[in-house]
A protein has these predicted regions:
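Substrate-binding cleft of carbohydrate-active enzyme catalytic domains
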Residues: 1-97
Length: 97
């Protein structure tokens, strides 16, 4: 999160005003023995509705993300949370096949 906060400050300095934050992604199956079940996938935002969906190896809490959005607003940067589907939705199918 500290990287994103610093990025917003730098963007503001350079008069950039929109940041897409990519919240889900997955690897390519050919790098995981051509097996989708072994392919890395993650959803990086805390979900109380679907608690098993949130990545175990690192994620943003709702409060943390809201604070980040408020900071960005102070610097004139709009945060657009990006949920990339259907292309990078392996985290969803791992959660609920």
């Amino acid at each position: 999160m500290s990287y994103l906060r610093n990025l917003v400050k730098m963007m503001s300095y350079y008069k950039m005003n929109t940041l897409h934050v990519h919240l889900n992604d997955n690897g390519f199956r050919q790098f995981f023995a051509d097996d989708w079940n072994k392919t890395q996938a993650a959803f990086r935002l805390e979900s109380t509705t679907y608690p098993g969906l949130t990545a175990k190896d690192g994620s943003y809490s709702k409060a943390e993300f809201i604070d980040f959005q408020k900071l960005a607003e102070e610097y004139g940067v709009e945060i657009i949370p990006e949920i990339d589907v259907p292309a990078h939705s392996l985290a969803f199918t791992h959660y609920k096949p």
